[in-house]
Amino acid sequence: MKRALTSVVLAPRNAAIAVISLYRRVVSPIYGDVCRYYPSCSAYGLEAVQEHGLVHGGVLAAWRVCRCHPWAEGGIDDVPARRVQQYRRTRLGFVVAPSHGKG
């Protein structure tokens, strides 16, 4: 029951991850490597949402996009690490409840 509830709670986060991933695969290659920061803004947004959730990660990503403009100095700008990892990431980047080994 708890695992099902966790999946429901994580659904909006995973929906945002799917949208950002789709953008990275379809739209981002059209523009090429134009971001002044490393990782790129879309990679930063993806990691921020994976790491911090939809609201806090979305705010971090929006702030990053606002800072990325032609006159920005750029450089390395990693997503702030979370103190405690609550969830794990799948191979496709979605966030799921941690699996606990049973025996």
Swiss-Prot record:
Name the UniProt key words of this record, in alphabetical order.
Cell membrane, Membrane
GO cellular component annotations of the record = plasma membrane
Signal sequence range: none
Membrane topology of the entry = Peripheral membrane protein
Where does the protein end up? Cell membrane
Q: Which Pfam families match?
A: YidD
Q: Which family does it belong to?
A: Belongs to the UPF0161 family.
Q: What does this protein do?
A: Could be involved in insertion of integral membrane proteins into the membrane.
Query: What is the designated name of this protein?
Result: Putative membrane protein insertion efficiency factor
Q: What is the lineage of its organism?
A: Bacteria, Bacillati, Actinomycetota, Actinomycetes, Micrococcales
